[in-house]
Amino acid sequence: LFACLITTACALAECAGQAEKTSAEFAEELKKLAARCTAIARAMDFSVLYDNTRELFHIGCSFEEGKLTPSHYDLLASECRLTSFSAIAFSRIGSEHWFALSRLMCDASGGRVLKSWSGTMFEYLMPLIFFETVPYSMQFEVCRNAVLTQILAAAAEKPWGVSESGYYAFDDALRYQYRAFGNPELALAPGRMRSDVIAPYACVLALAVEPKAAAENLRLLCQIGAAGKYGLYEALDYGAAEKNGFAIVKSYMAHHQGMSLCAINNALNNNVLARRFMSVPEVRANEQLLFENMPVDPIRIKTYELSLIHI
């Protein structure tokens, strides 16, 4: 939300500058909206969730219990790195937090990657809506290699793009269920991951690093029925096969549609949202955090198949 507000403020300011040529009154209204967005963003207090001892953010808080959750966001390959960077850039926390985030690296089929918790496209790619990336930087290479790993894992003539999404299971009210799906090579807990649910929004996010492959995959998704009246459906569940080999999760989630629209906007308009966010002076002053090099001789880990013992 913080990055959205800051980016929206930049867009409104740009529009105000253009509107001044035709309507001074309208331009003034746009400026007021931009100032309001900026004020809301700058009033946010990140420190409430920050653990100064561990230099990490808590996952959240329990209002029922009146305390913070004991778990933390401790991986660099996480959607939370957008929050981490924003909090550092706007002087809410110190830059030591960035270097406290785990950089656990492994050799996946698509290349060297940082481990994420669930191996989802959301964890790797969502921040790229707002971050400019530099080829050969760790962020760019890890995100691209994560996408390549998912591409290589896809069966022949089947689409790719695994992330957290709805799937073809229902509760008592016949609402689709939701959980994280990820690639086992990328996830810290591979034994818990299913990778047979394809989320079209995950492919749209991949436009940031593999635009040609993503466009071809989106074309395939549309050909096999993933597009509906209001855009791309939530998911294709290959674990709940019907006569065509999968079941379509015919729902639309606002945040997935929003991320998709932003990613498409970036792809068509020279990374416009990222350029706006990165143009803010506080962000520009800290951009070197995003350009960290891929380590020449990283510490790697081996992954093992988890076995379940039935008693």
Residue ranges and their predicted role:
Residues L1-L308:
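Ser/Thr/Asn(+Pro)-rich, low-complexity disordered segments
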